[in-house]
């Protein structure tokens, strides 16, 4: 199951980008034998200032056809890392070939786009800068693959 991070904004070179790349490479290596991956990032940018609706249109175009859509949103469901791993495995086992995670810009995701998503995921009640949300998602993808592979990365 391919995983696409569809995100608003461009991340410059720096520690956040390095962390994302590192965790996604780890996810690809660990997930390959599990039917997970590869992972990619599609960055979209509304240069015309059309707000959340314009960002939503760009994000919709970035989502692979037929993909499970999971929106990251503070109103979404919080879950443990093992629950997240089970969700990934469930979509994979249901024969879904693509999974797209949506991360909005500074104002979040458009309401209609959130409603379109099959799943909504929250990293807690706090609001996170989108660059940190990207890092956290990349790490949780790797952690989920490690849990499913039975490696010692996830310790409780």
From Swiss-Prot:
Catalytic activity: pseudouridine(1915) in 23S rRNA + S-adenosyl-L-methionine = N(3)-methylpseudouridine(1915) in 23S rRNA + S-adenosyl-L-homocysteine + H(+)
Enzyme class: transferase
Main location: cytoplasm
Range of residues in the leader sequence: none
CDD domains: RlmH-like (cd18081)
Compartments it resides in: Cytoplasm
Record key words, sorted: Cytoplasm, Methyltransferase, rRNA processing, S-adenosyl-L-methionine, Transferase
Annotated residues for binding of S-adenosyl-L-methionine: 72, 104, 123-128
GO cellular component entries: cytoplasm
GO molecular function, one term: rRNA (pseudouridine-N3-)-methyltransferase activity
Pfam family name, one: SPOUT_MTase
EC numbers: 2.1.1.177
Protein origin, superkingdom: Bacteria
Record note on quaternary structure: Homodimer.
Function: Specifically methylates the pseudouridine at position 1915 (m3Psi1915) in 23S rRNA.
Family: Belongs to the RNA methyltransferase RlmH family.
Record protein name field: Ribosomal RNA large subunit methyltransferase H
Source organism of this protein record: Dinoroseobacter shibae (strain DSM 16493 / NCIMB 14021 / DFL 12)
Biological classification of the source: Bacteria, Pseudomonadati, Pseudomonadota, Alphaproteobacteria, Rhodobacterales
């Amino acid at each position: 199951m391919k995983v696409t991070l569809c995100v608003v904004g461009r991340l410059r070179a720096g520690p956040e980008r390095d962390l994302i790349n590192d965790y996604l490479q780890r996810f690809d290596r660990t997930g390959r034998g599990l039917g997970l991956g590869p992972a990619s990032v599609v960055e979209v940018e509304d240069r015309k200032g059309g707000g959340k609706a314009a960002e939503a249109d760009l994000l919709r175009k970035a989502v692979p056809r037929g993909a499970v859509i999971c929106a990251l949103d503070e109103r979404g469901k919080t879950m443990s890392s093992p629950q997240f791993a089970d969700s990934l495995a469930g979509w994979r086992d249901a024969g879904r070939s693509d999974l797209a995670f949506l991360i909005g810009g500074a104002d979040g995701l458009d309401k209609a786009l959130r409603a379109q998503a099959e799943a909504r995921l929250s990293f807690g009640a706090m609001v996170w800068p989108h660059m940190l949300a990207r890092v956290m998602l990349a790490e949780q993808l790797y952690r989920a693959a490690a849990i499913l592979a039975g490696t010692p990365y996830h310790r409780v």
